C-alpha cells in the first residue's frame, strides 16, 4: 500500500507577559552620575544601551537589579528604566520613580509573537512516520536592549522621531533557536525538514517570552502526533514510543503513563485526558505531561501530571517550583490568553479584555523527577510550556472529539473547529 500523506496547520496569537504588577524603575541623576534601580533581566546590557542612547559614559552609570513582580523574558522593565533615566536627567538631584499603568503594560511592553506552524507527514500503512516537514511563520523573539541595531527603548524611538525598533533576527540552533526552538522533532523519523519563515515586519513589537518558539512548535507537533495516531487507530502513547529510541525520552513517557494511570482511563463525554512530550531545546530537560480536562461551558484543566528527567537535580524544591509555574502559565496561555488589537493599538489593555488564569482556576500539578544523579543537570525553567499546551489540546479533543488547532482553547475557538461548520 502506498504511503498516506497528512497536513495540518496550527496557530497561536500574540501573548503578553501578564505579570501581576506592572513595570517599575527608580533613577537618580546627581554629581554627573546616573543610578537606576530596575527589575530588568539584563542589567549589564541595559546599562550599555542606556549609556549609548543618552550618551552617558559607562563609568558614570550604575544599574542595580531589584526583584520585580514577574518577568518571563523581555517585558516593559527595560523601557520603564529608560523612562526613569530620561526624567531623572531632567530633574537632577531628585529621585524619580516610574510605574507603568496596567494599560501601559498590556499595550506597550514587548509581546510574544503570534505564529503559524504547518506540518506534513508521509506515513506507512501502519501509521509509521516516514517523512516529516515542519514550517514556521513567526516574528522575532529577539529585540532586547543590547541585541538590536538601534537602542530598543520606546523612549529612544520617540526621541529619534519614531524610528522603528528593529529586531535582532533569529539565534542559531546551537543556541536553542528562537521561533524555530523545538521545531526539530525529537522522534526517529527517517526524513525530516524544517523551514523557518522569519517575519521581519510585524504589526506589534515582539521579543522574548518564556520558551520562545517551543510553546507553539511543541503544541503543533504533539497535536499532530495525536492526529496521526488516531488516523492509524493506535494509542497515542504507543505511537510515540514506536518513534522513540532515546532511552531517557522513553523512560519519561513511560513514567508519566504510570504516574497518571493512563491505561485505566475511562472515556467520558465532557472529561478527557491527553499527553504531550518534548525535550526542551533538544538538549535540556525531558518533560512529559498528562492533562485531565473538563469541557462543559468552557475548558477547565483539572489536573496536570508531569514527569521530568533533568539529570542531577541539585535543588528539587526549586526545580519543582519552576516546572509547576511553567505548567500553570502554559495552562493560562492555552485556555485563555490572546492579545487583541485593531489598526491603531492594542485593545486588550485590562484584565477583562486580557484574562489570565485565576487562582481559583489553577489545576492540581503533580511533578515527579526521574532518578538521574549519574547524569549532568539539565535546564528545567521552560521545559513544561510546550508539553502542557499539547496535553491540554489533546485532552480537549479526547473529551469533545473536536480538534482545535488555534489557541487559545476558548468556547468560540472550539465551536469554530467543529466539523459541521
Give a label for each model feature:
Residues 1-421:
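Cofactor-binding beta-sheet edge motifs in enzyme active sites
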Amino acid at each position: 500500500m502506498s504511503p498516506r500523506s497528512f497536513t495540518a496547520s496550527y496557530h497561536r496569537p500574540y501573548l503578553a507577559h501578564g505579570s501581576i504588577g506592572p513595570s517599575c524603575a527608580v533613577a537618580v541623576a546627581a554629581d554627573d552620575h546616573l543610578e537606576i534601580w530596575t527589575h530588568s533581566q539584563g542589567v549589564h546590557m541595559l546599562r550599555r544601551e542606556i549609556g549609548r542612547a543618552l550618551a552617558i559614559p559607562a563609568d558614570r552609570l550604575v544599574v542595580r537589579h531589584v526583584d520585580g513582580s514577574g518577568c518571563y523574558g523581555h517585558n516593559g522593565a527595560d523601557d520603564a528604566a529608560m523612562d526613569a533615566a530620561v526624567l531623572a536627567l531632567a530633574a537632577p538631584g531628585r529621585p524619580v520613580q516610574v510605574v507603568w499603568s496596567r494599560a501601559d503594560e498590556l499595550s506597550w511592553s514587548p509581546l510574544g509573537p503570534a505564529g503559524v506552524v504547518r506540518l506534513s507527514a508521509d506515513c506507512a500503512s501502519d501509521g509509521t512516520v516516514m517523512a516529516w516537514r515542519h514550517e514556521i511563520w513567526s516574528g522575532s523573539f529577539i529585540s532586547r536592549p543590547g541585541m538590536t541595531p538601534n537602542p530598543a527603548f520606546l523612549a529612544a524611538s520617540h526621541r529619534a522621531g519614531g524610528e522603528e525598533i528593529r529586531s535582532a533576527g533569529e539565534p542559531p540552533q546551537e543556541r536553542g533557536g528562537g521561533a524555530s526552538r523545538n521545531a526539530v522533532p525529537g522522534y526517529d523519523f527517517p526524513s525530516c525538514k524544517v523551514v523557518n519563515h522569519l517575519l521581519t515586519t510585524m504589526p506589534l513589537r515582539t521579543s522574548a517570552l518564556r520558551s520562545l518558539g517551543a510553546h507553539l512548535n511543541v503544541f503543533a507537533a504533539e497535536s499532530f502526533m495525536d492526529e496521526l495516531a488516531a488516523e492509524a487507530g493506535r494509542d497515542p502513547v504507543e505511537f510515540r514510543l514506536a518513534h522513540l529510541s532515546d532511552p531517557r525520552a522513553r523512560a519519561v513517557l513511560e513514567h508519566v503513563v504510570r504516574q497518571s494511570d493512563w491505561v485505566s482511563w475511562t472515556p467520558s463525554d465532557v472529561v478527557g485526558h491527553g499527553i504531550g512530550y518534548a525535550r526542551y531545546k533538544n538538549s535540556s530537560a525531558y518533560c512529559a505531561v498528562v492533562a485531565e480536562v473538563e469541557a462543559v461551558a468552557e475548558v477547565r484543566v483539572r489536573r496536570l501530571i508531569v514527569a521530568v528527567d533533568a539529570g542531577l537535580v541539585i535543588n528539587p524544591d526549586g526545580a519543582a517550583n519552576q516546572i509547576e509555574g511553567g505548567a500553570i502559565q502554559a495552562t493560562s496561555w492555552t485556555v485563555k490568553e490572546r492579545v487583541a488589537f485593531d489598526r491603531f493599538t492594542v485593545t486588550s489593555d485590562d484584565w477583562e479584555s486580557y484574562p489570565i488564569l485565576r487562582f481559583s482556576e489553577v489545576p492540581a500539578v503533580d511533578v515527579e523527577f526521574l532518578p538521574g544523579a549519574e547524569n549532568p543537570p539539565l535546564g528545567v525553567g521552560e521545559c513544561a510550556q510546550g508539553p502542557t499546551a499539547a496535553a491540554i489540546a489533546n485532552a480537549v479533543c479526547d473529551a469533545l472529539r473536536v480538534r482545535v488547532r488555534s489557541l487559545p482553547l476558548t468556547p468560540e475557538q472550539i465551536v469554530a473547529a467543529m466539523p459541521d461548520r
